[in-house]
Amino acid sequence: MAFNYDRERHRKDGKQGRLIGQPIVLTIIWICWALFVGWLNCWLTAGIRATIDWFHSPDSYQFLNGQVNAQVFAILSNGWQTANLGNYQVMRSNPLIFAVIELIGAGVMLPLVIKTWLKWRPNHGNQYGNDRLTTEDEVLVQYPQIPDRGFEYDGVGGIPVSHIKATAPVFLKHHPVTWLRYYFAPEVSQLATRLPMLKNALPFVEPAKGFYSIDQTTVNSLIVGITRSGKGETLVMPLVDILSRGSEKCSMVVNDPKGELYQMSYETLRKRGYNVQVLNLQNTDFSMSYNPLQQIISFAKEGYYDETQQAVNTLSSSIYVDPNAKDKFWQNSSINLLNALILAVVDYAKRNDRWDEVTMDNVLHMMTELGSKQVNVNASGDIVPSAEELMADKSLKMPSDSSIAGQKNKLLVYFAQMQKLNEKHYSQFRQMALDSFAQSKFAGDETSGNIYSSAMEGIKIYQQSNIAKLTSKNSVNFESIGFPRTMRFRLPERYKFKTAVIEIDDDSGKKLEKRTQIVDKVGMLNYAIKAKLPDDFTIKIDFDYRKNEPDYRDAKLVVTGRKLYQRNGFTAHSFKRDPYTHQPLLKEVKLTIKQNELAGDVAEMKMDYSESPVALFLVTPPNNPSYNQLPAFAVDQIFNTIYSTALANGRKSFTRVHFLLDEFGNLPPISHMDTKVSIGLGQNLLFDIIVQNLEQLQINYSQQQADTIESNCANLLYILTESKKTAETISAKIGKRTVNVQTSSGKMGDVHGISFSNQFISQDIMSMNDLMKLMGGEMVVLRSVYRQDQKGHSVAAMPIFDHGQTAMPFRYTFLRHEFNDQMTLSDIGIKSPHRSLDLKALRINYDSAYNQLLELMDGG
């Protein structure tokens, strides 16, 4: 079927009717004509020679004198007799006459041959387009080849651009060793195990069904495929498998609508050493906990004021930003109001050291409990509670001036008291909250109600108790996705902005790694560890660096580290082991100061250690798209966290991270997504974006942003679409070729009146209709920056058309063991810290918080 389809597709170029225009054919015709002329030339040469001889003979004089007899024309008769046709002895006796006639006779045919060649010559595609598709041989030479299942391979993973069957002769021609190792040898071994004597002697190894050509370069990819086009079966699932089989395993952040990919791949990924996490918004009781304010909490606790404000603004902008909105007033007011509320909660947490209460649930209730109520106030702006309110809530207090001067919104009163307190006891977080509140225009009588409604619309999902619980705890460390091993030391303040030299040695003194790192503005030394550490190791930190002042260079800190494992008993090797990898489970890494020659104590030491890449699945319910706000937050925060850590640790994440964003059009706008796809590659952060058509990019992003996202995806993998605009765009990018079109005209039955004409035209290599009718497994790959083969030779990045023996296989035909579609949530032990959480126990009492503001003012 596929062969006939290809033959029908390529029949458009008209090559079948151009045999007469081939130079070899025209040369043969001309040679045949020359031979015919030579054959006839023998007779003409003999006749002409005889005629010349006759004029010089006595017979001609006798004829001219009227003496005619039978012998007068004997010479002429012998010369012009038909027996001389093909008599090449004449050529030897009369070479000059023969040559002249031969040249004239053969030359007569040349104009006709040349005219025929000009009319019927094959088109080589230079006049109106000379684009073409990449050949199978070129794909096999240009890309790394890996087995399509089972086997580990060298290097990092990459998106598959083609697949070829193991039995294809062209693959054996280019990669005989790979073919023998992954197909022939396992096939022979599998046959041998059928023999009774060898059944248990040889390991059972499944041979590869074929081989993938993968792009291991650091590029973004855009995948286009409508629903039910097979993109999950032919690309998404195989990509997860490929990324997890490389010797340098990649971390993955996968948007997984419905959660099927998470359930199917969990067991395989765990066996391959992955730390598999899931943010399950479809069933929050079987999900990790994710507090979108956790990054803000971390910055605020450590005293990073600017970073806290930036993280707050990024989060708020992610909720309310609409690049296609014409009136930005309500959008900006909502952003500033939410900024103010979050920072006010941060200020409360800092005052009371209750950081676990910095949650979106408390932010929401600050808005609902304070922003929706009007209260009586006195002339100073203090709340004057009624007698009933005093009886109902003992925490309320009557101000000294209990006369009612009017009513105000309770949220305005709260921030007014924050302003008064800040004038007496300055807090930077409090000032940030006040600045944002002032910018929100909430204090305006005419706009406050609309701003309140607009702001509530963006965070109403946190009214759902399941979402409120999930976002009130946090059980994932985003930094570990790109940097699985990190350590931090809070050093004395005098070392701020100094360059530290960090060296890590094993217990024998062998150096594992050494690098410089700057102590940041709060005195924190954050360091990402690239090497995998032994059970016992030593960390040496000194300031003997040329850019440090001399009086700092003698400072030194030596710390010993030891891995502590979870135990089942008291024997030396009674460790708890991972049920999938069978490796001991790490409990913690204990750090002990061995030598401190710093000018002060080390206030904090901590190491987060893992040797596992992370696979984080973001399960989004298709029937409740409002929940997709959280995965969008997660993608943004993961990128920002890893990006900033990478800049401080060699500019690249130690583990390559693939953001595999299926159904990208259903996700809310990810903050600065156009910038992320532009700058992320330098930090080893790759995006694989999947849409149903190119227009989907413009649903949540402006035209300019959508164009930037598309142009920064070096690979465009097209599977199928129903969008004519998308198909036309893809067709134009594939290119055009020149074809010769023949037309005929004439009346029916008039054989001699038919005329033919030829015209060169430009034709799409693959038309819009061709692209909208691709068969299952067929795929077009547009690549823009892949311009070197495996040997470093420059190549042209021609489009690839996967079809026939290079069609992409479906997952269920060869990856059933790796992706078990029978696995369900009940088979996976998911621990959810928030499952039994009491929301009320974490909720802030804002009346008490208000009274605290008053007490702090009075106490000041």
Where in the sequence are the language-model features?
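Conserved P-loop NTPase "ATPase switch" module shared by AAA+ and STAND
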Residues: 653-669
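Conserved P-loop NTPase motor module
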Residues: 450, 454, 486, 490-491, ...
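Basic- and hydrophobic-enriched, low-structure N-terminal and domain-boundary segments
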Residues: 1-229, 233-241, 246-248, 285, ...
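Loop/turn-to-beta-strand initiation segments
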Residues: 249-251, 613-615, 655-658, 683-688
